[in-house]
Amino acid sequence: MGNSQPRNASRSRRTSQWPQGAAELGASASDHHYHQEELYQEQQQQQQQPQQEQPSSRRIQFQAHTNQPTQSHPPGDEEQPVQSQQQQLSTWSLGSLSGGRLNWSFSGARNSFRHRNKATRKSLTSLHGSRRGKTQWHRPLTNSIFNSHFKETSKNDLYRIDHLVAKGAFGVVFKVSSKSDISQCYALKVLKKSKLIEDNSVRQIKDEADIQKVCGHHPFIVKQIDLWQNRHNLHILSEYVPNGELFSKITHFSIDLVRLYIGEIALALDFLHNAGIIYRDAKPENILLTEQFHIKLTDFGLSKWLKLGANTRTMCGTFKYMAPEILCGEPYGHAVDWWALGVIACQMLTQKSPNIKRHLLRRRESVEPEDGLSNAPSIAQINGCLQDSDGDSEDFLPEEVQHLTHEGRDVLRKLLTIEPRQRIRSVMALQRIAIYKDYNLSSKQLLSLSPREIIARDGIRIYEDRHFDQLTNQCAIDAFLDF
């Protein structure tokens, strides 16, 4: 055809299978045989006709597969109108011109009549495991859901897993090291995408990534380094904080160490609040100790964007550290983080937690959709209960509080106030209480102090790191290895 050299009959005759959509076109097995013979006869006639050379281009004619045989225009006749040609060509798809030979196929056909050279045939048969026409599926939906924050890639060749650090509801945290420099260590949080989607936590994990990215430059907040995803998991790579969780290393605190740690946690919380973020998960497990024993906040899975002065109603957090207004199902704001800080301070000073009449502060089990009422008590009811109980309004504090210094009792009273509006809610307010008299509550000032020196001076015991057993560690690695 065109300018291509004539072939002999044995090479030019090809076997063509009828397209997959033949039923829709009204074709049958007999039609199929008829068209094979018709195509062969037309090809022989065209080879016998004199060829007309064109100096600048080749003339390519297509004939559509229809029930009525179509004839080529002899040289010199007028061509069909463009619209008619388009109707014929609409059934066919043009592949590519390779080595002066045309590759073309019937749209939707499983196998079709094709002119190909050897190289083209090899490349096409190797595509999709040598199955021509196999559908290229789009990326998994779970990838698209997280694509705005987590790029699709693999980091297996960059990091190696050292050991398991922590386990959670959605995944695990590993200590990993760089393969190019084993002295560079990181914390790798691996989360199951299926669990996040099942728990409707997609927006939550995206907020966590955004918040840690925005606030990670603060000296008392863990820095985020990288985010990525693969088919099954999300990965958050952060700086590694070597001395682990606060209470896993230290169980008894002097008043000077409490003053330092409460100040550092307060500065981190105040920074988050001023950035329009509520933390909602302040607890010892999320307070890590650096190599110099300064603190860093981690795990922003329950954090939320919330402007100062605004309220939210989501019931979340760890029960022991949840403020009364959360447990009562009332709207709450950033003051809940300061309550949690008070609970941590109470634990450091007395080794016990406050007891807020938990039989009254039970979780909401049901909320009526009509009026939003809850069976939990109100703040006013709690205050009334405390005032009617034996003793003073500090009845929920441990008895050991009575043996503390004035500074220790004062900081607990101001942080653990039932009424949120009367609670300490800023570093500025914290600076005015007795424990921070003549003390500069700033990041620069606190970083200039040495917790190690305070620990050594006050004879505070530091416990060794505790790791997961080998079986648990290996099971976690096997479950989350594909990073």
UniProtKB/Swiss-Prot annotation:
Pfam families, A to Z: Pkinase (PF00069)
Segments of skewed composition (Polar residues): 1-19, 55-73
UniProt feature, compositional bias: Low complexity: 41-54
Entry's EC annotation: 2.7.11.-
Key words of the record: ATP-binding, Cytoplasm, Kinase, Nucleotide-binding, Serine/threonine-protein kinase, Transferase
Cited SUPFAM superfamilies: Protein kinase-like (PK-like)
Knockout consequences: Mutants are viable and fertile but display NMJ overgrowth with excess satellite boutons, fewer and larger synaptic vesicles, defective synaptic endocytosis and increased levels of tkv.
GO molecular function: ATP binding; protein serine/threonine kinase activity
GO CC terms in record: cytoplasm; cytosol; nucleoplasm
Region (Disordered): 1-90, 113-136
Main location (coarse class): cytoplasm
InterPro entries linked to this entry: Kinase-like_dom_sf, Prot_kinase_dom, STKc_AGC
Compartments where found: Cytoplasm
Names of the cofactor(s): Mg(2+)
All residue ranges annotated as the Protein kinase domain in the record: 159-435
The family this protein is said to belong to: Belongs to the protein kinase superfamily. Ser/Thr protein kinase family.
Quaternary context: Interacts with tkv.
Its job: Displays kinase activity. Inhibits neuromuscular junction (NMJ) growth by interacting with and promoting the proteasome-mediated degradation of the receptor tkv which inhibits bone morphogenetic protein (BMP) signaling.
Entry protein name: Serine/threonine-protein kinase S6KL
Organism of provenance: Drosophila melanogaster (Fruit fly)
